């Protein structure tokens, strides 16, 4: 299902663009008149978004429910819900982003009343819409996600959750790019390096990011893990950033913030910060809006303070994605709380690992010259991890035979290749590569998985 704001022509245009790209039937698009602002009140949300959408879905059999005309204190109908058949709900730019706290609707929820940070009903519109088929729930605090960490999400409780993602950004073109980049990346698979900025004030977050780094290294991706007390400097190495995970900076920074920077197709970025998605209309404030403006394919954010333990866990996200699952399934596998602050930005059907490394290697000659070395480098890294040192050196030789390699990238490969040759006991080849590296004038920066 695709949801658009009929008061915003670009919202409807975006919905039609997505439907055309993913072959979604026209009857699965619903456009409702909504306020043209990012933040709305609970009465506005119930009156213009939640209830009209739920009624539409019930009337057409997308949600299996019956119920009288009775309503709760917020104005929601008290449907008895038995399930739904909505694969994903894609919310388009123009649909409001977040719901402000409404004191009139606040009722203490057992377990939350003693914790002031949870005594609120503010939240993300998308997160509230995940519970369209849940039945009436207390809007105060948060609802545990029954899909969190569930490998086979076919239990009755899990089937009450609607998987919601958003196509949104500073401009129509930015938002449309989310699906365009996803489809482009699915033709080649995920190609590039990872970058992880571990610094932060909480042990849980550091543990998550350490686990994510280990997962990506086990998948063969070359990458850097920064453990300094600062964010990545603008001068940091940042070639082919197809995967980035970090936290605790208020606004986009480092190489990503440089003028003209663009992410490669397929890039997945998660920066953990309390208000990273407070607005999606700015290309310079926060994280999510600027990331989408710079061509990211999938990202995640928080519209209000979520508290660390209730945010998307990056290591769980990568676990699901690397198993071949799509963005929609993976994001909710990694999200502990609903009716809360987190949103998922991107095409729910995007499968970054739909193309295997073996398939990438078989097609490496057809890849753009700037991408091919990263596929071979990933294969070499896997061989090194398996102890197949001589085979890894052979792959590095194949990479370095590419005369079209940009000098900076060639120097990066030379460093890794020389280390691999030393490990394989091939001193003469290591010396030759080191000699070429010195002659190139490349700075002596450390390479690989720091």
Placement of each model-derived feature along the sequence:
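Cysteine-dependent hydrolase recognition
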Residues: 1-406, 410, 423-424, 428
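Generic low-complexity, intrinsically disordered sequence content enriched
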Residues: 133-136, 418, 441
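Terminal, low-structured helical/coil segments at or just beyond the last alpha-helical repeat
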Residues: 431, 439-450
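Solenoid-like repeat scaffolds
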Residues: 400-406, 436-444
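The tetratricopeptide repeat
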Residues: 375, 413, 446-448
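TPR/Sel1-like alpha-solenoid repeat signature
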Residues: 414-421, 433
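TPR/TPR-like alpha-solenoid repeats
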Residues: 382, 420, 437-440
């Amino acid at each position: 299902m695709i949801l658009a704001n009929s008061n915003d022509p670009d919202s409807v245009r975006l919905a039609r663009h997505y439907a055309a790209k993913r072959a979604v039937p026209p009857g699965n698009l619903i456009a409702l008149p909504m306020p043209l602002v990012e933040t709305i009140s609970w009465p506005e949300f119930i009156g213009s978004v939640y209830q009209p959408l739920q009624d539409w879905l019930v009337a057409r059999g997308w949600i299996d429910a019956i119920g009288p005309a009775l309503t709760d204190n917020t104005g929601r109908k008290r449907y008895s819900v038995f399930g739904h058949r909505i694969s994903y709900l894609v919310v388009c730019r123009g649909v409001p982003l977040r719901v402000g706290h409404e004191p009139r609707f606040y009722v203490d929820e057992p377990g939350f009343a003693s914790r002031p940070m949870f005594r609120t009903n503010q939240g993300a519109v998308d997160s509230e819409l995940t519970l369209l088929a849940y039945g009436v729930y207390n809007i105060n605090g948060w609802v545990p996600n029954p899909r969190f960490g569930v490998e086979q999400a076919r239990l009755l409780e899990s089937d009450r959750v609607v998987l919601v993602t958003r196509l949104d950004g500073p401009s129509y073109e930015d938002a449309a790019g989310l699906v365009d980049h996803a489809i482009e990346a699915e033709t080649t698979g995920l190609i590039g390096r990872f970058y992880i900025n571990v610094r932060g004030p909480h042990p849980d977050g550091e543990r998550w990011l350490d686990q994510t780094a280990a997962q990506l290294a086990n998948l063969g991706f070359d990458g850097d893990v920064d453990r300094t007390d600062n964010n990545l400097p603008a001068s940091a190495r940042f070639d082919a950033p197809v995967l980035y995970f970090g936290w605790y900076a208020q606004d986009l920074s480092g190489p990503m913030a440089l003028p003209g920077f663009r992410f490669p197709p397929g890039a997945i970025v998660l920066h953990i910060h309390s208000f990273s998605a407070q607005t999606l209309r700015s290309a310079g404030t926060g994280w999510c809006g600027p990331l989408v403006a710079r061509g990211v394919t999938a990202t995640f954010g928080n519209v209000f303070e979520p508290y660390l333990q209730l945010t998307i866990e990056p290591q769980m996200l990568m676990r699901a994605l690397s198993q071949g699952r799509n963005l929609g399934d993976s994001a909710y596998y990694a999200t502990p709380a609903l009716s809360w602050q987190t949103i998922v930005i991107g095409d729910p059907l995007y499968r970054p690992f739909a193309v295997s490394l073996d398939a990438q290697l078989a097609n490496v000659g057809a890849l753009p010259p700037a991408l091919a070395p990263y596929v071979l480098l990933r294969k070499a890294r896997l061989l090194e991890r398996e102890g197949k040192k001589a085979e890894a050196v052979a792959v590095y030789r194949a990479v370095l035979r590419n005369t079209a390699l940009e000098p900076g990238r060639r120097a990066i490969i030379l460093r890794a290749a020389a280390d691999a040759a030393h490990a394989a006991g091939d001193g003469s080849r290591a010396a030759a590569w080191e000699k070429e590296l010195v002659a190139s004038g490349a700075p002596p920066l450390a390479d690989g998985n720091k």
